[in-house]
Amino acid sequence: KLPDMGSPADAIFSANDEARIGRMIMQSIRASGQVVEDPLVTEYLNEIGSRIVAQTNEGDHDFTFFAVEDPRINAFALPGGYIGVHTGLIDATRSEDELAGVLAHEVAHVTQRHIARAVHANSRQSLLTTAMMLGAMIAAAAGADSDAVQGAIAIAQGTAAQQQINFTRTNEYEADRVGISALAGAGFDPYGMASFFEVMSRQQTTSPEMRAPEFMRTHPVTTARIAEARSRAKDYPLIRSDDSTSYGIARARLIVASFDTPEEAVTYYEKRPYENQNSIERYGRAVAYQADGRYWEALDIYKDLLESNTSVIAYHIGMGETLVALDQPRDAIATFEKALALFPRNAPLVIAYSERLIELGDPIRAHTLLLDLLNNVPPTPEQVRLIARAASAAGEEAEAYYYMAEYQLMIGDLTGGINYLQQALQLPELQEIQRIRFEARIDFIREFMTEEQLKMMQSSRPVGLAALQE
């Protein structure tokens, strides 16, 4: 086997460059508040995304899948393996296979390094585009006006970037080919990708007066491309399976969140009589009742769902949360503890239980559970922020500062991370072992900071732990 000499694109846009730029864009998207911070939705997307990635034989890429609160039908791949899916697209899918098909396509854009290859193919124009994109990101991160922030987000989500970077027709076909192979290997219907393309194409054909779905403008879909996708799917065994419960749970939660008011969500789920609804529709109804403060009605549904199926974590979480809202802490804790015994170290469950424990005045137990989860399961930024919140409520101020620093690092804010660590070093009750740990962390972070970031750090103001109450 010949040694890997690398790609010509690496000379202009290396994998490290992609990772760094991806982190910057993600920092801006998170700052906009558009990332859906729902642990059940996030875990689901990463679960099926990981199944697809496992079929690509690309161990060199780290992937993060996340949902973006946006009714437009679109998905996008960012440098560094960040895959974003609009809530509008998830709602538009008719099956889990279609959603998996979209994710497989976006994963292929990353594994085939299409952005880097496009930069190499047209380096002058693409580097200018990259410079413009980074300028928008920096402006947004620096607190520029809303137009600048929205412009940065639009670029990051692909409405501008994918047009400016200009994925070629060859790249789109390659993403389809590689994606369909991964789709089939992961156990999904290989026709899922073509099926979603057809839905988008049909929507535009039957309603030409409507604006084309964002997905079709950033990922042009032609009749020939649909036919090619279907032809490639024939090379793989036909897989027919029901949608997973997790797919239905995620869609139901996003549907409830999409309404302007909880009352509208309740109206939506009450259109059909309860006895005619399936379990997912009943779950959506319970979530809507919960959001609307109709806790007794929600509790009745969760009890009904758990009597039929105890294997769905979301049902346990919903019941526990509702019992807390009904001021029944003993029953709530018993519900969560029983669920923990069934599903140890499940991230959405531990997060939901820990939030309720803090609310019920037991932050020490919450802190213990969250640290155990952190040591065994890769965390999300919001999960680390919750550790800081639990530590603060438990009187562990130094640890609260430390984990707020880690949260800032996870969202790409190195300056903010050092800021929190430096404040922790000023605490009079700081233990020597903590001082050594915090100083070592600061030294480690500095190695990754630019001269400009180091200057910004010198002029930054202390932020304290007030943000934990937001």
Task: Give residue spans per PLM region.
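Extracytoplasmic and endomembrane cell-envelope/extracellular-matrix remodeling and assembly machinery
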Residues: 5-12, 23, 35, 43, ...
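Catalytic zinc-binding patch centered on the HExxH motif and its immediate surroundings
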Residues: 67-81
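Short pre-active-site segment immediately N-terminal to the catalytic Zn-binding motif
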Residues: 84-101, 163-170
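Active-site recognition of the HExxH zinc-binding catalytic motif
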Residues: 85, 101-109, 113, 175
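Catalytic Zn2+-binding segment of zinc metalloproteases
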Residues: 97, 107-124, 142
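Membrane-active amphipathic alpha-helices enriched in small hydrophobic residues
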Residues: 127-142, 151-160
